[in-house]
Structure formats: structure tokens, C-alpha cells
Amino acid sequence: MDYFTLFGLPARYLIDGNQLTTRYQELQRQFHPDRFATQPERERLASMQQAATINDAYQTLKHPLKRAEYMLSLQGFDLGNEQHTMRDTAFLMEQLELREELDAIERKPDAETLLAEFSRRLAQMTTTRTQQMVEQLDAQLWVQAADTVRKLRFLDKLQQQVEQLEERLFDDFA
């Protein structure tokens, strides 16, 4: 059973987060290992496995990029374990330039202001790519969606670097 079916959700990218959380809580109550404490070992193990599956499914569907990767995995794309080389040279050049820009920000006297502007631009790029990905997933353009997800992973890693720099700047200021 796929994760969407487990939670009673349609297999599409845009999901109802409240419905996901409500169904997660219901399933957790239903399959919590404590409810099976007095049952035979086989049933206890089955409930533990089911609870683990429910947790994995919830974490996957709750996180937007993981949800997209999961949808693609249902179509045969294993983005989590692939060693795919990005062939979009314009995107790769843009990423190199963004990383260089981010590295340079840390050494500037107005680093906080520059980082805030950089972060806004990055958020806009991510929003644009996410909208593109949603359209591709809805249209079942799996190859294009997989490529867009790969690009979103780059942007996600860059966002993590932005957050790390924010922490360093805050620590230096404190």
C-alpha cells in the first residue's frame, strides 16, 4: 500500500496538511505498540512495524521535497540513491555563482543585509521551481518533474548553507 492510500489521500503533490495530520494521529492510536502489549509476539511485532511505516509515511508526505521524491519513486525514479549528473549547464553555472556569492557575503561588512537579500532571491527561485514541479507532477511529466526536483535539492542545500551562515553571523554578533 502506498503512503497516500495509507492516509486516505489522493496521490497528488498538493495535499491537505490537516487531513494528513488528523489521519496520522488516528493511525498512531490504532497501531500504537502499547495497545498490543498483551498480544502474542507476532502481533506486537506487526504493530511495531505498522507504527514505523506510519511514521515514515507521515514524515515523507509532510515534507514537500520528500513528498515529490516519493511520488516520483512510485513512477520508478529513485532520486534518493541515484548518481545522476545534472546536464543543465545554465543551472549549474547559476548554482556556482550563487555559492560564490554566498561565500563572499560572509566577508562583507554589511553581511546581514546582503544575506537577507540573498535569502529573498533564493526563496523566490525555490517558489518558482516548486510551482513548475507541481505543474509537472499534475501533468504526469515524470522526467521533467524529476529534473526539477533535482534542481530543488540544490536550492534546498543552498538554503541550508544560508541558515548556517545566519547562525554564524548571529553568533559573531552575540
From Swiss-Prot:
InterPro entries named in the record: DnaJ_domain, HscB, HscB_C_sf, HscB_oligo_C, J_dom_sf
Record-given protein name: Co-chaperone protein HscB
Matches recorded under HAMAP family: HscB
Keyword Chaperone: yes
Subunit structure: Interacts with HscA and stimulates its ATPase activity. Interacts with IscU.
Positions of the J domain: 2-74
GO biological process terms, semicolon-separated: [2Fe-2S] cluster assembly; protein complex oligomerization; protein folding
Record organism: Yersinia pseudotuberculosis serotype O:1b (strain IP 31758)
Similarity annotation: Belongs to the HscB family.
Keyword tags: Chaperone
Disulfide bond positions: none
GO MF term list: ATPase activator activity; protein-folding chaperone binding
Biological function: Co-chaperone involved in the maturation of iron-sulfur cluster-containing proteins. Seems to help targeting proteins to be folded toward HscA.
Lineage: Bacteria, Pseudomonadati, Pseudomonadota, Gammaproteobacteria, Enterobacterales
GO cellular component: iron-sulfur cluster transfer complex
